[in-house]
Amino acid sequence: MKKKIAIIGVGIAGLTLANLIKKNSDFEFMLYEKEESLSLDDGFGIQLAMNSVSILNKIDFQKVNSKDIFHPKAIDFFTIKNEKICDLEISKFNSEYSKYTTLRRSTLIEFLKDEIYTQHLRFGKHIKEVTELKGKILIKFYDNTNDLVDYVVGADGIFSNTRSFFEKKKNQPSFKKAIAV
């Protein structure tokens, strides 16, 4: 019998993991998202370092239309007061197949959702409780449904609620008051 993984969160991390599992393993999986739908608004641009592009290439990232991506040659770093700290020529780190890449977040989400959207994704699933049951993990949701899984992956972002079910300390992100453009 296949082991089952619950992936909590349908952002870039959760969708990427789901695609990797679908393509390369014998695990069953389900993605759970507390929102009612997947936001595909154009939104912000994101930056992908070469390591992340090399991972995305394993799930056919090269299928994304080349008109929708950009490969900058350098990055300038500034303080919050718009004072330049330094610049970095990032094209030196590129390889033939993995290049520093920028694109709209919605473009990446659209690509990631295509292979898993209908059969592996459940919306409106806000976790109420997580308990152990006979060596497995029972996840109860506020909509009075539940799932019994072998593993849980918290991919619900920096302000993750999933972690609170598994660890006592609160994870607080810190902002260093610097930006890169």
Walk through the language-model features, giving the residues of each:
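Charged, low-complexity surface patches
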Residues: 10, 45, 101
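Conserved Rossmann-like nucleotide-cofactor binding loop
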Residues: 13, 37, 159
